[in-house]
Amino acid sequence: MSDVSGDGDLSATVTEHEVTPQPPVSSATYPSLTVSASYKESSGGKSSSKRRPIRPSFDAAADNEFITLLHGSDPVKVELNRLENEVRDKDRELGEANAEIKALRLSERQREKAVEELTEELTKLDEKLKLTESILESKNLEIKKINEEKKASMAAQFAAEATLRRVHAAQKDDDMPPIEAILAPLEAELKLARSEIGKLQEDNRALDRLTKSKEAALLEAERTVEAAMAKAAMVDDLQNKNQELMKQIEICQEENKILDRMHRQKVAEVEKLTQTVRELEEAVLAGGAAANAVRDYQRKFQEMNEERKTLDRELARAKVTANRVATVVANEWKDGNDKVMPVKQWLEERRFLQGEMQQLRDKLAITDRAAKSEAQLKEKFQLRLKVLEETLRGTSSSATRNTPEARSMSNGPSRRQSLGGAENLQKFTSNGALSKKAPASQMRHSLSINSTSVLKNAKGTSKSFDGGTRSVDRGKALLNGPGNYSFNKATDDSKEAESGNGWKENSEEKPQSEDPEAATEDSVPGVLYDLLQKEVVSLRKASNEKDQSLKDKDDAIEMLAKKVETLTKAMEVEAKKMRREVAAMEKEVAAMRVEKDQDARAKRFSNSKSPSNTAQILAGRAAGRSGGLTKSTQ
């Protein structure tokens, strides 16, 4: 983008690959200015080459530092790029969170399957417990039968002793057969009964041991059942907690969707604002071209006024010299006492000297006002620079880290161009101050126009990384198209004004007609810049709040994942304990089965022996009875 400076020279345009300086309009020599276009990021993804700016030589280093503070990359686009990167990171984090949620769901399904297997094992253990209880009941019945048999054997023993007593009593009374013959079978029966009683006592002891072991096994089984019930309750609690966590995750996802919608709305609003800013920049550039043309005309007009004033002065001097020559010629024939300057000549010389003194006073007043206005503008610029430094400190630091070379190559010439524009405008004010009848209001308007034009140049040169070349192309189009049109139009208007009204009317009417337009053009960018600054601050706050909410959600997800991990570990430990208990129960059941088989075999063996013993006892009893009968018959 090439701008027309206040003194009439065109600054050189620097594109991506070549530098095309344009010739100056006037014959005066001024330092050539350059504008460096920033690196553009094209849609095809091509990387732009390095630019070769032409660096002008300035003497004042303080002015360079002052203008370098005015320049900077576009904060809105940098902030938008940063927000888009953050949104992508958050989307990536959401994808990871969804993957973790899927993994947690799979782990929950596996836990449910494990719980179902444990419930099946518990049902099997309950069935085994019922079987053991039925076996214990059968054993108790057998123990009762054995006790009854024991009581019957004791009763038989008491009956045998009673018979022995009777036999002894009968021997005393009557002559009986020998007692040994009668007692031998009875003693044999007693021995058999005692042996059976000992076996039954051993069986009772073994059954007592079995009952105690069964009771201990039942107690352990009850404990395992209680533990399994507690685990089932824990599993239910875990399922409820998992459902609550799933609900919370869904709520967080809905909140994320709402935040994404809000972010999209903010991005759309920022895009609209950037579009309006671009349109306003285009309008400002168009107004700048027209303003440059108007400044050229004003400068030419002031030069012509100065020439007219010099001609008037020369005419007055010529008149004075002519009058003096006339007086000298007239006084040649007079005496020394009669040689007196005429009153008309003295009045003209006095008027001429008073006019020159008034011009000098006007110049002093104008320079004082210009110095005061420049001091005020400097204070305003310093305040604006402080605000810009505070707002753009974070974004500019990130941007300078990424592209320090691009910043160093693109900032210097553009800032120097804005500095050159300010110097040219100051020269313009100093040249314009030479006019004789310029009022204080016109000087104030011109100073305000010059200050705002400095800001325009600074804003125009501060191109962003994306739209730098676009602004260059727009500046070229504006200078080639509407700039020439406004220039020609201004020349036609000036010719008509000169033909109609003359020098004084043009000098008074042109600034009055151009001041409100310049004021309106200059007041718009500041308001829009403040609005954009407020929007950037609000977007930063929203992004910070969103980051904080996402961090809280990530912390909650991490806590939930830790809880799930601890629960899974507890479930694994409990499953291992259950497996160990089930293995121990199976071993005990196998041992009980072996003992039961041994008991059944022992019972079968005892049952096979008992018929033979009873047959022997009955045979002995029958023989004793037959012997007694024979003795009684004898």
Swiss-Prot record:
Gene Ontology cellular component list: cytoplasm; microtubule
A GO BP entry: cytoskeleton organization
Family, as annotated: Belongs to the MAP70 family.
Molecular function in Gene Ontology: microtubule binding
Protein function: Plant-specific protein that interact with microtubules.
Segments of skewed composition (Polar residues): 25-35, 393-417, 443-464, 605-616
Underlying gene: MAP70.2
Superkingdom of this protein's organism: Eukaryota
Signal peptide extent: none
UniProt subcellular location: Cytoplasm, Cytoskeleton
Region (Disordered), start-end ranges: 1-57, 393-526, 594-634
InterPro entries linked: MAP70 (IPR009768)
Name of the molecule in the record: Microtubule-associated protein 70-2
Originating species: Arabidopsis thaliana
Low complexity compositional bias, start-end: 36-47
UniProt keywords, alphabetically: Coiled coil, Cytoplasm, Cytoskeleton, Microtubule
Pfam family, any one: MAP70
Coiled-coil stretches: 74-392, 532-601
Segments of this protein annotated with the region Required for targeting to microtubules: 258-494
